[in-house]
């Protein structure tokens, strides 16, 4: 049963990542990989909210599997973040590579902490 929840979440997360990335990149035709950045920060926020909800006792383990492992696991993409950072470096866009690495980690952690804080404030 648990693996079905993960699959169901991933069936939404993977296409959502693809469509969101394409839409953001079309809107922001830039060297910086805004699509992947937006997706990963959003995924961190959702995981933070889910973690806060679980610690408050309002998110079941099944919901964690569906949204956390399935949806967010398929939505977020560390491999694409790494690949895009490497490609920026290889094409001479070292500043953008460094900005991507620093901003992605900082914004992702900030979003995760904000999600936990907001969920705990809401359900505490």
Curated annotation (Swiss-Prot):
Pfam families: CRCB. It is found in: Cell membrane. The chain crosses the membrane at residues 1-21, 30-50, 56-76, 102-122. Keywords: Cell membrane, Ion channel, Ion transport, Membrane, Metal-binding, Sodium, Transmembrane, Transmembrane helix, Transport. GO terms for molecular function: fluoride channel activity; metal ion binding. Na(+) binds at residues 73, 76. The keyword Magnesium does not apply. InterPro entries: FluC. Belongs to the fluoride channel Fluc/FEX (TC 1.A.43) family. HAMAP family: FluC. Fluoride-specific ion channel. Important for reducing fluoride concentration in the cell, thus reducing its toxicity. This is Fluoride-specific ion channel FluC 1. The gene is fluC1.
């Amino acid at each position: 049963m648990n693996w079905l929840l993960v699959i169901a979440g991933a069936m939404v997360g993977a296409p959502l990542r693809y469509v969101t990335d394409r839409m953001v990149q079309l809107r922001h035709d830039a060297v910086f990989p805004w699509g992947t950045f937006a997706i990963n920060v959003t995924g961190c926020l959702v995981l933070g909210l889910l973690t806060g909800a679980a610690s408050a006792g309002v998110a079941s383990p099944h919901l964690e599997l569906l949204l956390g492992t399935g949806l967010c696991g398929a939505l977020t993409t560390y491999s694409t973040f790494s690949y895009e950072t490497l490609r920026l470096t290889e094409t001479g866009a070292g500043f953008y590579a460094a900005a991507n690495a620093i901003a992605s980690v900082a914004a992702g952690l900030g979003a995760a902490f904000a999600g936990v804080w907001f969920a705990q404030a809401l359900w505490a």
